[in-house]
Amino acid sequence: MSIHIVPKEQLSKDRINEKTADYIPPLLFANLRNLYQRRAERLQQLAKESSFVDYLNFSAQVAEAQQKALHDNPLKMEIADILEKSVIEGKPPLDCKTFQRTEHWQKLLHSLIAELLPDASEHVNAALDNLEKASEQELEQMADALLKNEFSQVSPEKALFIWAALSLYWAQMANQIPGKARAEYGEHRQFCPVCNSMPVSSVVQIGTTNGLRYLHCSLCESEWHVVRVKCSNCEQTRDLNYWSLDSEHAAVKAESCGDCGSYLKILYQEKDPKVEAVADDLASLILDAKMEEEGFARSSINPFLFPNE
């Protein structure tokens, strides 16, 4: 199954199966009012019991800066035409590899830099200073490379801040989509149906979506439904295994696939209601190391930790 976003009117005319549309929402948009603040608080909480205390607290500062930049730089745009075109082409409406960005994302970047500079360490200060002095063209080139998954083209210390701004931009746009989502047969379920980016992790939720697994987008912060006990990367079900560091009842596990050799973290809200897709993924880096030792490759990206090769 794949997920496509269509205008509300078209969804009504198509008379999509009510059980799929109503009881298993294919797509959930982020609540930007408290997303980044909640992430910052979770990072700070996890830092208290982590050997990565300094980096988790630093990441919390970035998340807090994102919350402020979001508040100070609202975005209003007409997205109905973009959605209609994406329906015709059968592509994600905000495809990160082809979408024509405006200067708004750079405005968000400079807002983040201004917020973070006063308390930045010497190493972070150097990265922020370099970004602040970079030309618009240089920033666009680095953004292009990151959105095309060409991570080796951008140093990790710069990539973090550029992605933080791009993520804010895409999240703002995603929240203005006036359509609904429908699930239908197709491919590429491993990528976000809104922006075509990779997930960061997946969350088995509680509440109105109790027991359902949603992949969380590393860019636009949207979440899309993928059934459990199926590889989110290749959709095979034959050779799945679940790994954890503590016990079989751990709130954070890794789902590995013997068919494609990949793995993705799964967070269980029923085990810990406070788990957060980005924060808990970042705080469980030891589990990533274990999965690499076992020969599995990560099928996701964390916005606070970019590969340098």
Curated annotation (Swiss-Prot):
SUPFAM superfamilies: FdhE-like
InterPro entries per UniProt: FdhE-like_sf, FdhE_C, FdhE_central, FdhE_N, Formate_DH_accessory
GO terms under cellular component: cytosol
GO aspect biological process, one term: protein maturation
Keywords for this protein: Cytoplasm
One Pfam family cited in the UniProt record for this chain: FdhE_N
UniProt-annotated location(s): Cytoplasm
Molecular function terms, GO-annotated: ferric iron binding
UniProt xrefs under NCBIfam families: FdhE, PRK03564.1
HAMAP family linked: FdeH
Recorded family membership: Belongs to the FdhE family.
Function: Necessary for formate dehydrogenase activity.
Stated name of the protein: Protein FdhE homolog
Species in which this protein is naturally found: Photorhabdus laumondii subsp. laumondii (strain DSM 15139 / CIP 105565 / TT01)
Record lineage: Bacteria, Pseudomonadati, Pseudomonadota, Gammaproteobacteria, Enterobacterales
Gene name of the record: fdhE
